[in-house]
Amino acid sequence: MPGQKIRIRLRAYDHRLLDESAKKIVEVAKQTNAKVSGPIPLPTERSLYVVLRSPLKHKDSREQFEKKVHKRLIDIIEPNSKTIDALMKINLPAGVDVEINL
Protein backbone atom coordinates (compact mmCIF):
# COMPACT_ATOMS: atom_id res chain seq x y z
CA MET A 1 0.00 0.00 0.00
CA PRO A 2 2.36 2.74 -1.16
CA GLY A 3 1.54 6.29 -0.18
CA GLN A 4 -0.76 5.31 2.68
CA LYS A 5 -0.44 6.14 6.33
CA ILE A 6 -2.10 4.67 9.41
CA ARG A 7 -2.66 7.12 12.26
CA ILE A 8 -3.30 5.54 15.66
CA ARG A 9 -4.51 7.63 18.61
CA LEU A 10 -4.34 6.10 22.06
CA ARG A 11 -6.18 7.47 25.10
CA ALA A 12 -6.12 6.24 28.71
CA TYR A 13 -6.43 7.40 32.30
CA ASP A 14 -3.26 5.55 33.33
CA HIS A 15 -0.13 6.75 31.52
CA ARG A 16 1.79 3.54 32.29
CA LEU A 17 -0.79 1.38 30.49
CA LEU A 18 -0.75 3.85 27.63
CA ASP A 19 3.05 3.75 27.25
CA GLU A 20 3.09 -0.08 27.34
CA SER A 21 0.41 -0.23 24.63
CA ALA A 22 2.24 2.29 22.45
CA LYS A 23 5.47 0.30 22.84
CA LYS A 24 3.70 -2.92 21.75
CA ILE A 25 2.25 -1.23 18.66
CA VAL A 26 5.61 0.27 17.65
CA GLU A 27 7.40 -3.09 18.11
CA VAL A 28 4.84 -4.93 15.96
CA ALA A 29 5.02 -2.30 13.22
CA LYS A 30 8.83 -2.39 13.16
CA GLN A 31 8.85 -6.21 12.98
CA THR A 32 6.86 -6.00 9.73
CA ASN A 33 9.33 -3.47 8.23
CA ALA A 34 7.00 -0.46 8.34
CA LYS A 35 8.28 3.03 9.10
CA VAL A 36 7.02 4.31 12.45
CA SER A 37 6.75 7.87 13.72
CA GLY A 38 6.01 8.11 17.41
CA PRO A 39 4.72 7.60 19.99
CA ILE A 40 4.16 11.34 20.18
CA PRO A 41 2.76 12.55 23.52
CA LEU A 42 -0.23 14.85 23.04
CA PRO A 43 -1.49 17.33 25.67
CA THR A 44 -3.21 15.75 28.66
CA GLU A 45 -6.89 16.62 29.12
CA ARG A 46 -7.49 17.68 32.70
CA SER A 47 -10.99 18.03 34.17
CA LEU A 48 -11.53 19.35 37.69
CA TYR A 49 -14.80 18.74 39.55
CA VAL A 50 -15.63 20.61 42.77
CA VAL A 51 -18.38 19.18 45.01
CA LEU A 52 -19.83 20.40 48.30
CA ARG A 53 -19.02 17.97 51.11
CA SER A 54 -22.21 18.69 53.03
CA PRO A 55 -25.64 18.65 51.39
CA LEU A 56 -27.08 21.47 53.55
CA LYS A 57 -24.49 23.91 54.87
CA HIS A 58 -20.73 24.51 55.19
CA LYS A 59 -20.28 25.95 51.71
CA ASP A 60 -16.60 26.59 52.45
CA SER A 61 -15.95 22.86 52.78
CA ARG A 62 -15.56 21.42 49.29
CA GLU A 63 -14.01 18.35 47.79
CA GLN A 64 -12.05 18.42 44.54
CA PHE A 65 -11.79 15.56 42.07
CA GLU A 66 -9.54 15.49 39.03
CA LYS A 67 -9.70 13.40 35.87
CA LYS A 68 -6.71 13.23 33.52
CA VAL A 69 -6.83 11.69 30.05
CA HIS A 70 -3.38 10.96 28.62
CA LYS A 71 -2.98 10.71 24.84
CA ARG A 72 -0.38 9.38 22.41
CA LEU A 73 -0.17 9.49 18.61
CA ILE A 74 1.56 6.91 16.40
CA ASP A 75 1.93 7.21 12.61
CA ILE A 76 2.76 4.09 10.60
CA ILE A 77 4.06 5.15 7.20
CA GLU A 78 3.93 2.77 4.23
CA PRO A 79 2.21 -0.16 5.97
CA ASN A 80 1.87 -3.50 4.22
CA SER A 81 -0.72 -6.24 4.64
CA LYS A 82 1.45 -8.00 7.25
CA THR A 83 1.48 -4.83 9.34
CA ILE A 84 -2.31 -4.56 9.34
CA ASP A 85 -2.74 -8.26 10.19
CA ALA A 86 -0.24 -7.98 13.05
CA LEU A 87 -1.95 -4.86 14.42
CA MET A 88 -5.32 -6.63 14.42
CA LYS A 89 -3.92 -9.48 16.53
CA ILE A 90 -2.45 -7.31 19.33
CA ASN A 91 -4.08 -7.69 22.75
CA LEU A 92 -4.20 -4.33 24.51
CA PRO A 93 -5.35 -3.66 28.10
CA ALA A 94 -9.00 -2.79 28.71
CA GLY A 95 -8.18 0.73 29.95
CA VAL A 96 -6.76 1.90 26.60
CA ASP A 97 -8.97 3.45 23.90
CA VAL A 98 -7.63 2.98 20.36
CA GLU A 99 -8.73 5.07 17.38
CA ILE A 100 -7.33 4.15 13.95
CA ASN A 101 -7.52 6.31 10.81
CA LEU A 102 -6.32 5.19 7.39
Curated annotation (Swiss-Prot):
GO molecular function: structural constituent of ribosome; tRNA binding
InterPro entries: Ribosomal_uS10, Ribosomal_uS10_CS, Ribosomal_uS10_dom, Ribosomal_uS10_dom_sf
UniProt-listed GO biological process terms: translation
Keyword Ribosomal protein attributed: yes
Disulfide bonds: none
KW Transferase (keyword) present: no
One GO cellular component term noted in the UniProt record for this chain: ribonucleoprotein complex
Keywords assigned: Ribonucleoprotein, Ribosomal protein
Subunit structure: Part of the 30S ribosomal subunit.
UniProt similarity note: Belongs to the universal ribosomal protein uS10 family.
General function of this protein: Involved in the binding of tRNA to the ribosomes.
Entries under HAMAP family matching the protein: Ribosomal_uS10 (MF_00508)
Name the record gives this protein: Small ribosomal subunit protein uS10
Source species: Fervidobacterium nodosum (strain ATCC 35602 / DSM 5306 / Rt17-B1)
Recorded name of the encoding gene: rpsJ
